């Protein structure tokens, strides 16, 4: 069996004595879509911040691609191949779709400022390669109609798609999706669900997803972990989670049981 892409063991994180993450352990395997669910304030985003190096837990271990990443700075972890989208869109609104996607290539740029200024040799060749790669993302996410427009002029759902594309431009080995369909209408949600599955199945990128849309989670996830006040309740397949009495009572109720 392949080694886990990411693994947390007995992670504890507190702020001023308040437990944000309380004894969480899980692993994400190659090709897997692993979802984390729970109410607001359950510690889901804190777990993403632990994984990506924004927060350092007081206890526990965090491994990515077999390496201990506890204490590494976020840009170092990103350079290893961990990409992330956010609840709130974090794009440069005055830049075009293509320019925003190109920003995701920054860690793959191997030429200096002088070469870039002179636009010759290695800089020119690499720039062309990066643009070809970004154009493939435009095709993959069906962004052709907006490729040259400033992001600030685009509909919300398309902006979320651009943010997803920028994460893909990093060539991630693990993709963290923080509420990828928040605020979307039904059509946008269905489109995003399709792109997420294509990322997992066609690009073979494992995914950790935090999401409040229970229907989406149950349809897409291979496994789900449920947390409450930072404490894990259960981890299992969607079918197993749906049958867990504490999950039904506390979070899902009749939404998935009916």
Model-derived regions: residue spans:
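Glycine-rich phosphate-binding loops of nucleotide-dependent enzymes
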Residues: 2-258
């Amino acid at each position: 069996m392949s080694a886990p892409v990411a693994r947390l063991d007995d992670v504890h994180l507190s702020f001023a004595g308040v437990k944000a993450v309380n004894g969480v352990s899980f692993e994400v395997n190659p090709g897997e879509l692993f979802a984390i669910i729970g109410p607001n304030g359950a510690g889901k985003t804190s777990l993403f911040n632990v994984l990506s190096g924004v927060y350092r837990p007081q206890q526990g271990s965090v491994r990515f691609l077999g390496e201990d990443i506890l204490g590494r700075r976020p840009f170092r972890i990103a350079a290893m191949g961990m990409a992330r989208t956010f609840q709130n869109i974090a794009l440069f609104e005055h830049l075009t779709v293509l320019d925003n996607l190109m920003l995701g290539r920054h860690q793959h740029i191997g030429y200096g400022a002088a070469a870039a200024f002179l636009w010759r040799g290695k800089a020119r060749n690499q720039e062309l390669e990066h643009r070809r790669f970004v154009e493939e993302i435009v095709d993959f996410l069906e962004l052709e109609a907006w490729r040259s427009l400033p992001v600030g002029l685009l509909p919300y759902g398309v902006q979320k798609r651009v943010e997803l594309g920028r994460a893909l431009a990093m060539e991630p080995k693990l993709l963290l999706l923080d509420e990828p369909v928040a605020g979307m209408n039904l059509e946008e949600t269905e489109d995003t669900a399709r792109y997420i599955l294509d990322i997992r199945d066609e690009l073979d990128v494992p995914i950790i997803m935090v999401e409040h849309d229970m229907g989406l989670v149950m349809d897409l996830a291979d496994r789900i972990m449920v947390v409450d006040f930072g404490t894990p309740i259960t981890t299992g397949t969607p079918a197993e989670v749906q049958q867990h009495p504490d999950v039904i009572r506390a979070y899902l109720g009749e939404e998935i049981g009916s």
